[in-house]
């Protein structure tokens, strides 16, 4: 990950224009990318974008509480169809994927805190326990 903040306790404001200007970094499967908005130690908050027709393969975070808020589009996640405005909590050890992405793709805000090991790059973690 590039340009990751690691400044717990410091004020940070990303305007909509700042976030729009951040590059999407490809992770894992084709059509899946993310932007890290904030990171301190092992806590990460970011955005994930999944293009129409793409999917985020099933994976599991054995030691991480995973929170997701869908900001755009629709998809299937943990056996449910969710759309913009939906919130999903995924406890540690629960397999999850993003499938059946709507025609406009989907985008979601995520946060998680790995509890078992330091956070590596998305490429190292993709599809593997965190």
Predicted region positions:
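Glycine- and acidic-residue-biased ligand/ion/polar-headgroup-sensing regions
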Residues: 62-77
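Short acidic-glycine-tyrosine-enriched beta hairpin
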Residues: 77-97
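A short, N-terminal "cap"/entry segment at the start of jelly-roll beta-barrel domains
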Residues: 1-42, 123-130
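Solvent-exposed residues in well-ordered beta-strands and their adjoining turns
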Residues: 51-53, 76, 111-113
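Conserved short histidine dyad/triad with adjacent acidic residue
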Residues: 27-31, 38-61, 92-95
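Double-stranded beta-helix
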Residues: 3-6, 97, 101-130
């Amino acid at each position: 990950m590039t340009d990751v903040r690691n400044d717990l306790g410091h004020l940070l404001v990303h305007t909509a224009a700042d976030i729009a200007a951040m590059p999407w970094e490809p992770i894992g499967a084709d059509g899946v990318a993310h932007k890290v908005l904030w990171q301190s130690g092992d806590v990460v908050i970011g955005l994930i974008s999944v293009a129409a027709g793409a999917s985020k393969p099933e994976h599991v975070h054995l030691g991480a509480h995973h929170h997701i808020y869908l900001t755009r589009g629709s998809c299937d996640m943990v056996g449910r169809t969710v759309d913009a405005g939906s919130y999903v909590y995924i406890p540690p050890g629960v397999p999850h994927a993003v499938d059946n992405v709507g025609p406009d793709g989907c985008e979601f805000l995520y946060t998680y805190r790995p509890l078992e090991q330091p956070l590596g790059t998305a490429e190292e973690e993709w599809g593997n326990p965190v």
